[in-house]
Amino acid sequence: SLWEFAQMILEETKRLPFPYYGAYGCYCGWGGQGQ
């Protein structure tokens, strides 16, 4: 579900998963690991 997907992103990034559909695959914009 969309909630489970958001929870997965939250666990991966340790920060708020919004907008999770935009940040997915490119965390560099959020200062992340740049997948």
UniProtKB/Swiss-Prot annotation:
GO biological process terms on file: arachidonate secretion; lipid catabolic process; phospholipid metabolic process
One MF annotation (Gene Ontology) recorded for this entry: toxin activity
Which SUPFAM superfamilies does this UniProt record tie to the protein? Phospholipase A2, PLA2 (SSF48619)
Co-factor note (free text): Binds 1 Ca(2+) ion.
Where in the cell is the protein located? Secreted
Task: Report the catalytic activity.
Answer: a 1,2-diacyl-sn-glycero-3-phosphocholine + H2O = a 1-acyl-sn-glycero-3-phosphocholine + a fatty acid + H(+)
Other comment: Has a pI of approximately 7.8 and about 121 amino acids.
Assembly information from the UniProt record: Dimer.
Q: What is this protein called?
A: Basic phospholipase A2 BnpTX-2
Species this chain originates from: Bothrops pauloensis (Neuwied's lancehead)
